[in-house]
Amino acid sequence: MTPIQNAQQIFNRQHKNLPEITVYAPGRVNIIGEHTDYNDGFVMPCAINFGTAVSGTKRDDHIWNVYAADLDETDEFSLNVEIPKSEHKWANYVRGVVKFIQERYPDFQQGANLVISGNVPLSSGLSSSAALEVAVGKFCQQLGDLPLSHTDIALNGQKAENQFVGANCGNMDQLISALGQENHLLMIDCRSLETTPTPVPQDVAVIIVNSNVPHDLVTGEYNTRRQQCEEAAKFFGVKALRDVSVEQFQKREAELTALSPLAAKRARHVVTENQRVLDAVEALKNNDLTCLGKLMEASHDSMRDDFEITVPQIDYLVELAQLVIGKSGGARMTGGGFGGCIVALAPHDKVDSVRKIIADNYEKTTGLKETFYVCTASQGVRVI
C-alpha cells in the first residue's frame, strides 16, 4: 500500500469520513554536491519515488490533532497559543513548520485532523524529515488558502529544521522535495535558488543502497562541519565558501592549513565539490557517464579524506558498486554522512550485477544487511 492510500484509509477509519486534503512530498537522493548547500553552493539531487503523505480535514477550532501512522503516535497542539516543543521528535518537524507559517501569516489559526504516512527509510540520508516538512507546509497552504510558492514552502521547512528542531541543515533537501521534476536531476544554486533541470539519461538507473548504519544529524558532527566551513569562509573574507574558486583556495591553502588544518580540509572539500557539480552538469549534457563516474568517485574520496564523514561500511559499498559499474557510471556516499546510503548511476543492464556483488559480500564482511532500491526521478510536492 502506498503512503497516500495508507494515510487516506487510516484517516477514514479514525474520523469516519474522507479527508478533504491529501498532499504528498517525496524524499530525495543527491547525485553530487554534498555539504555544499549551507555554503551557498551547488547541488544536483533528484526527488525519488519514496515520500510522505498527509491527509486531513478542517476542524471547527484551533487544535491540530496529528497521527503518525507508521509510529502509532499522536500529537496535539493549539494554533492560538505559542507552539511549544514536543517530546516526540517527529512532532517537532510538524510543529516547527506550522509555527513559522503562523509567523508569516498570524491569522492562520485553522485547526485540523491529520494522518501522516511515509515510506522514506528513517535515518537513511534520504530526507524523510524534508519530505515531512514540505508535505505539512503544502497542507497548511491548502488548508488556509495561503499565497505560498513551493520555494516558500521549502524555505519554511528549512527554517523549522534549523530553528525549531535544531539541525543546521542547508536548503537542498526541502527545495528538491518541493521542486523536483519527473525524470530529471535538478541542479540547484543554493544562493540564488535558481534551478536547472537535467534529464536522467534514459538507459541509466538511479540505485540507492542503504548501509543500515544508523545516523542522526542532530547529534553534533554535522553542526561542527558547518562551523568549520564558516571559519574557513571568514579566513578568505567571504560570505560563504561558494565565493572561493579552486585556484583561490590553492593559493592560500598552506596559510589556512597552518592556522587550522581541519578548516582547510573542510574547505578543500566544499570548494572542489562545487566545481564537481558544475562539471557533472556538463558531463550529463554530453551523456558522458565515464566523466560523471570519475566526478562521483572524486566526490566520495573528498568526503572520506577531507570532510571525514564516511564510515568503513559506506566506503566498502562504494568500492563494491564501482567494481561492477566500471567506466559506465559511478557511485558515492550520499546524504549527511556517518552512515546512511550510497547512490550509484549505472546502466539498467548492470543493476542486477551491482545488487549481486553487494548481496554476496556486504553482510558477510560487515555483519549488516543492506537495503537495495532502484529509484526513479520523481515530481516534487503535489496535491492528490
From Swiss-Prot:
Record: residues binding substrate: 34-37, 222
Coiled-coil stretches noted in the UniProt entry, renumbered to this chain: none
Main subcellular localisation: cytoplasm
Alphabetically ordered keywords of this record: ATP-binding, Carbohydrate metabolism, Cytoplasm, Galactose metabolism, Kinase, Magnesium, Metal-binding, Nucleotide-binding, Transferase
Enzyme Commission number, as recorded: 2.7.1.6
Domain of life of the native organism: Bacteria
Effect the entry attributes to changing residue 321 to V: In strain: RM 7004
InterPro entries (UniProt xref): Galactokinase (IPR000705), Galactokinase_bac (IPR022963), Galactokinase_CS (IPR019741), GalKase_N (IPR019539), GHMP_kinase_C_dom (IPR013750), GHMP_kinase_C_sf (IPR036554), GHMP_kinase_N_dom (IPR006204), GHMP_knse_ATP-bd_CS (IPR006203)
Binding of ATP, residues: 123-129
Summary of the function given for this chain in its UniProt record: Catalyzes the transfer of the gamma-phosphate of ATP to D-galactose to form alpha-D-galactose-1-phosphate (Gal-1-P).
Protein name stated in the entry: Galactokinase
